[in-house]
Amino acid sequence: MDSSFKRASFKLPPGVNIDNINEMNNNNMNTAPAPAPAPIPTPQPTTTTTTAPQRKVTFGSRVRAQEINATPTPTTPAPAPTTTPSENDTAKKDDFDFDPVPVSRPRATRAATMIPSNMLGDKRPIRPLGKGFIGADRQTPKPETDNNNNGNNNNNNNNNDNNNNNNNNDDDDEDEDDDEYSNVSAPSWNSVLSKAKTNTMNSRKRSGMIHDFVDVNIKNDSGGENSANTTSEDGSSSRRGTLRKAIVIGTHNPQPQQEDDVEETTSRISSLDLANVQRPRPQYHTIDPASIPQWKKNNEDLVNTMEQQQQQPQQPQQPQQQQSTVGGLFNSILKKQPNNNANNAQRLTRAEAEYNEYLTKSKSQRFPEIEALNFIYPAGKDNLGRTIIVIIASHLPVREMDMERVLLYTISIMDPVVEEEYVLVYVHTNMNNSNKPSMAWMKKVYTIFNRKYKKNLKGLYIVHPTTWIKFTLGIFKHFLSSKFWKKLTYIDDLGELFKTFPREQLALPNAIMMHRPAGKKSQPIFGAPLEDVINRPDNPGEIPVLFEKGIAYLSRRGLQVEGLFRLSGANSQIKSLRQGFDQGEDVDLEDVEDVHTVAGLLKLYLRELPSPLFPFDLYSSFIEISKGEQTKPQKVESLKLLLSLLPPANKALSKHLFKFLGKVIENSSVNKMNSVNLSIVFAPNLLKDKEGNVMDAVADAQFVNQVVQLILDNINILFNY
């Protein structure tokens, strides 16, 4: 079977044998054609079967070629036999099972083109079409080369189409249905997509006739050029061909296919599925801008560039695989433009050259006067291994320094660091007008510092920022990328900074450590745990600032004073000093004239510690050493072991306190304060029972004094200094 036809199948009526049909076909080939086909008797269910005529049903438009032509040739159609269906005939019709034929229609209306199942069960007779019965006009001679096509010439006995074949002189395939559509052009998209549902096939409303209502324009002057099946690029099985031709179920011998004369865009459509439609290729027009005076006037720079490129010697280029047909303006766009970044490269080169010049000068010079200011220095590495650079702006007297040398010194410090990732801690504490550099100098620094300064900067911490520094950064907002603002962190409290970097590593000056922003309330020192006081941001050393200042004051002015720590100072002055320290003020003890007031302030601090300098859990151990019968060296070793068990904060304060008391003992000949007298004064403040029982405290007072005296007598051994 030829592959150009759609596959269709049907069931033979009961009692019909395919061998009988083949035998009848052979007899018809050997006999002369009859004027009309003989009626075939209806097979009986209880008798021997007789051959039933082969039904050839044509689905599609039934418009006659004679009706289309302007001057139809008169023909004498043969009378079509009519049959009256009976109950058996109805049953036979119901036995036909035609496969739904795919019709080239959108999916939404495809169901309307299917064969209604109840059509074959209609008891009305099949309406004749004017000549013969259904399929009688589709007579096709059997090709000489096809000897195995069984049943293709069953209708050769019907001679009622001979006149029609003679009248159509331009037809060479003797296929009337194909000729009916030979002058029909391909349907357009609008005619197919806008077809109303009421114009679809409906056999019941058309009295049993099957029609295809596709709007087509008949071209009378096309002749036979557009006839035959389409053989375009879609192939012989294209569904587009079935839209313009009748759909046949039954036997039919097709003629050789011919190409359809359709437009290029229509031939690319393989189906009505819009998702697979190939769009027409875009059309480009060549425009020569040189022929447009107004364009040349408006684009003089582009024309000059093109002329210069034409004058320059062309370098041999590799042959391109595909030559572009675009010319004129589009050629100028597609051609490789000159490097527009040349100016930027020169600008970057000038900046780098200037930076390299400063770097060379910085390596060949020394800056002792700037180095003594200590306004910029590396401070080790953070926990991620990044170098920390600390800048203290208040240490740089701008008005008194040569800022060019300051820039050279800054480059000498920063250049080895910025090769890798680094972190910058900028301390803006205590800034005033004498420390603020000019905007021109800051802009110059920003311009000279090359990309590695900005790229490798992973964190910028601004300590104690003011409105001026925030305003200055706002000015440079348009020159800074969004990544810079993600690296920026404002630090108002040093405690937040010390959570990121160790206090000892940053080594900030005391003036910075003691700074407290305005409006921030300080926590009290007296009565607070020793460890908390030491870890506060405003406490720069390893001991409370109160003790640090007090010991320094007494070392200068109190070692020669008789009765130091034994005599009490003015209670009002002690209270005033305590309030100043608790409020976070920078108390200057040099203004205090009475030495005993400062000594009393230190004893008050030790007395109000929530946990004594020698903790409660070691109280019994100290008492046992004093009560024991060990030798003095053994007791010293035991004390050394207990002192090593002290917390770090307690150990640091004990070391500073007893070191100072050792100096007092050294001057005991003047101040009358030996180890015995000092033990009586400090023992109750250094070692106490947690229970706080007065009777036990009185009973253990002697042993407490003895253990403190033993420590004072062996300060050098116990504290290793």
Curated annotation (Swiss-Prot):
Residues covered by region (Disordered): 1-325
Localization annotation: Cytoplasm
Polar residues bias (residue ranges): 182-202, 219-240
The CRAL-TRIO domain, residue ranges: 363-520
Rho-GAP domain segment(s): 528-719
Segments of skewed composition (Low complexity): 17-33, 146-168, 308-323
Protein name according to UniProt: Rho GTPase-activating protein gacY
InterPro entries: CRAL-TRIO_dom, CRAL-TRIO_dom_sf, Rho_GTPase_activation_prot, RhoGAP_dom
GO MF, one annotated term: GTPase activator activity
UniProtKB keywords: Cytoplasm, GTPase activation
Keyword check for Cytoplasm: yes
Gene Ontology biological process: small GTPase-mediated signal transduction
Any one GO cellular component localisation term in the record: cytoplasm
Residues marked Arginine finger (site): R566
Biased composition (Pro residues): 34-44
Role this protein plays: Rho GTPase-activating protein involved in the signal transduction pathway.
Residue ranges the record marks as coiled coil: none
Residue ranges, compositional bias (Acidic residues): 169-181
Gene3D superfamilies reported for this sequence: CRAL-TRIO lipid binding domain, Rho GTPase activation protein
Organism: Dictyostelium discoideum (Social amoeba)
